[in-house]
Structures are given as C-alpha cells and as structure tokens.
Swiss-Prot record:
Reaction(s) catalysed (UniProt annotation): 2 R'C(R)SH + O2 = R'C(R)S-S(R)CR' + H2O2
Cellular compartments annotated: Virion membrane; Host cytoplasm
InterPro entries noted in UniProt: ERV/ALR_sulphydryl_oxid_sf, ERV/ALR_sulphydryl_oxidase, Sulphydryl_Oase_FAD-link_ERV1
Organism: Variola virus (isolate Human/India/Ind3/1967)
Positions of disulphide bridges: C43-C46
Name of the featured protein: Probable FAD-linked sulfhydryl oxidase OPG072
Co-factor(s): FAD
Gene Ontology cellular component terms for the protein in this record: host cell cytoplasm; membrane; viral envelope; virion membrane
Amino acid sequence: MNPKHWGRAAWTIIFIVLSQAGLDGNIEACKRKLYTIVSTLPCPACRRHATIAIEDNNIMSSNDLNYIYYFFIRLFNNLASDPKYAIDVSKVKPL
C-alpha cells in the first residue's frame, strides 16, 4: 500500500501520541502506542524500516520522552519525500 495515501495521517497520529505523553507524562503508554502504530503500518517495507530503526536506537528502552520525540522527527525527516516537508529541528521545542 502506497504511503502517499496514509503516510501523513500516520505521522500525525505519531506526533499526537508523543504530545499527549508530554502532557500526561506516561512514557510507557506512549511507547506501547507508538510500537503498535509502527508494527501495523499498511506498507510491509515501511513497517520493517521503522521497526528496525526503533530497535537500533533503543527507543523502547528509553525513558527520555524528548529522545523518543526527536528520534521520530529525524525518522520523519529521513523519509520525507520532499525536503520542503522536513521539520526544522532548531524550531522544535522539547516536550
């Protein structure tokens, strides 16, 4: 399934989940939700790529919400189909 059809919605949900964790402080619930989202992406290649990136960066064992947040920003920027969609990290405030 082509990420052009569902990618923006998936990224929006990912960043909403991260923002909610910034408000309620429940990092473990946030990580579970993020892993569920990533492990159920409709594109098998996207699912594999994101899961490997999460494992390689020890996201599930981190208790630092901002580490997780900036990881997903970097992942988004690496996958952005057009540089104009990239998030300027210098303008992002920590959660």
